[in-house]
Amino acid sequence: MVFLLCFFLVADVSYGINKDCLLPMDVGRCRARFPRYYYNSSSRRCEKFNYGGCGGNANNFHTLEECEKVCGVRSRDSPKEN
């Protein structure tokens, strides 16, 4: 019973969010420090991080506005700096 409750709570939070936004933050395998934004599904905000320049995943946006638009975040919920 508890499992089902947890499942539905998690499903409700992620329903309708672009699947790329649910990927974990990934700085990539290179060592550059490009400022980027990713959607943090725990805080439900777009947050800043430093991208290494290669590799990584699709949860990687050039601007806060792009992250918010793709991931459906309201501006008042962001930004959160890392």
From Swiss-Prot:
Dual-function toxin that inhibits both the serine protease trypsin and voltage-gated potassium channels Kv1.2/KCNA2. Residues 76-82 form a propeptide. Disulfide bonds join 21-71, 30-54, 46-67. One of its GO terms (cellular component) is extracellular region. This is U-actitoxin-Avd3l. It holds the Pfam family Kunitz_BPTI. Belongs to the venom Kunitz-type family. Sea anemone type 2 potassium channel toxin subfamily. The keyword Signal applies.
